[in-house]
């Protein structure tokens, strides 16, 4: 590990000796002896979260992830630190000088680890002092997720519940980090702090379920650098890497985006042949694969992509029409996802999400956000969709719309408010709910993702 060195000025200690002159046969007086100085030692005091700490019987200090540790030496010092296992401990908000070593401790693992802070006196390298900490296991929720965002990007979200902090890293490696906090008004929801949030109400939030995270974040507006808007995302740490496991029939919603324009897409798709083929029904009326006329079925080949869990698709009738998909696991259920740039002109940014088709429609209540920047509670029963959505300005929009049959061949696809002006489609699987605006109406391009508690 790299030492942190700091300059120091050595103190020079002098002693004066006296001499006497004899006269008349008198004797001379001897000089005073040089004083013997005690050997210097390097000592430290330790504080944890601002309070004095006492070492255990074995000379080590017990701390938990998220604690702020301060080590203060009695001599100006240079510093080094290490963890065992290597890399298991990271530091946040480090403040290191010749007179102090301070940082918040994060355990990057779900097991206990050891962390050592080593001081070496700047003026005398022979003087050293190790301060050893037993660091408790990190929170089991300290995980990283592959994120598929509705602005058409793929990112990585790392959450640390010990330090209540996050890092969101985009495809270029640009990382933004800050803190998050529990939402006191909605158990199980957490609020992202971000300098990108400028609205009166912060609707950048997330919720967790087994292997997955669903939320909203101030991502860059698609293809508009420097502009940000709160938009939904879904992330998973369980991505299907076995090709045959991709197989399934999915109801798939999507949006296409470029500056000033946004469109919706609603399709049923089927991955078949042990994950080697993707079938898509291109009928104007939304139609199941089973009921789709053969001339309206587009077939794509599927092969392994550039990274584990990414699968490349190529239209067998048009090699320039290609893309990528992934299947992620959310609480044990398969979810089809895609985010990126369309290879076909005009090269829209695209987002796709698909749930496994089912003959069952469930009564559910979810929490989630939409690409209007709202966050709220979303309810479905046999006949009605309801939502209480908090807008960025803090006002609440309450809606209650009737559900409609959207496709005779796809029972799990529902229409919302087909008798009204703002018309939507909905799907759900008991864990996720997704709503998309219908094409050619005022809410075209709308997308909402909710997670059932």
Residue ranges and their predicted role:
Residues 129-137:
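C-terminal edge beta-strand
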């Amino acid at each position: 590990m790299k030492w942190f060195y700091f300059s120091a000025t050595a103190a020079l200690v002098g002693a004066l000796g006296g001499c006497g002159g004899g006269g008349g046969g008198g004797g001379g007086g001897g000089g005073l002896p040089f004083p013997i100085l005690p050997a210097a030692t390097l000592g430290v005091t330790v504080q944890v979260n601002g309070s004095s700490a006492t070492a255990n019987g074995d000379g080590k200090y017990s701390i938990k992830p998220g604690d702020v540790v301060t080590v203060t030496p009695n001599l100006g010092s240079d510093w080094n630190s290490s963890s065992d296992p290597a890399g298991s401990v990271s530091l946040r908000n480090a403040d290191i000088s010749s007179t102090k070593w301070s940082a918040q401790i994060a355990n990057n693992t779900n097991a206990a680890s050891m962390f050592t802070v080593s001081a070496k006196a700047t003026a005398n390298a022979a003087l050293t002092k190790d301060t050893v900490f037993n660091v408790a296991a990190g929170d089991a929720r300290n995980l990283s997720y592959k994120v598929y965002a509705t602005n058409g990007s793929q990112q990585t979200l790392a959450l640390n519940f010990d330090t209540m902090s996050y890092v969101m890293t985009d495809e270029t490696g640009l990382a933004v980090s800050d803190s998050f906090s529990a939402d006191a008004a909605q158990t199980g929801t957490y609020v992202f702090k971000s300098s990108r949030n400028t609205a009166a109400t912060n609707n950048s939030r997330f919720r967790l379920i087994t292997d997955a995270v669903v939320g909203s974040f101030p991502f860059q507006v698609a293809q508009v650098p420097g502009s940000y808007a709160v938009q939904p995302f879904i992330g998973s740490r369980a991505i299907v890497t076995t090709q045959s496991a991709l197989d399934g029939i999915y109801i798939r919603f999507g949006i296409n985006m470029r500056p000033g324009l946004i469109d919706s897409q609603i399709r049923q798709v089927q991955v078949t042949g042990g994950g080697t083929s993707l079938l898509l029904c291109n009928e104007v009326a939304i139609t199941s694969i089973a009921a789709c006329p053969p001339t309206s079925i587009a077939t794509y080949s599927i092969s392994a992509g550039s990274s584990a869990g990414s699968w490349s698709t190529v239209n067998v009738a048009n090699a320039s029409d290609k893309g990528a998909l992934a299947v992620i696991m959310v609480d044990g259920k398969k979810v089809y996802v895609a985010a990126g740039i369309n290879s076909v002109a005009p090269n829209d940014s695209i987002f796709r999400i698909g749930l496994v088709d089912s003959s069952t429609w469930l009564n559910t209540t979810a929490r989630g956000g939409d690409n209007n920047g709202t966050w709220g509670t979303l309810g479905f029963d046999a006949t009605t969709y309801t939502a209480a959505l908090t807008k960025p300005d803090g006002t609440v929009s309450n809606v209650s719309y009737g559900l409609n049959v959207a496709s005779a061949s796809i029972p799990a696809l529902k229409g919302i408010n087909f008798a009204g002006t703002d018309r939507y489609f909905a799907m759900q699987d008991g864990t996720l709910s997704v709503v998309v605006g219908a094409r050619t109406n005022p809410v075209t391009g709308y997308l909402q993702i909710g997670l059932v508690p």
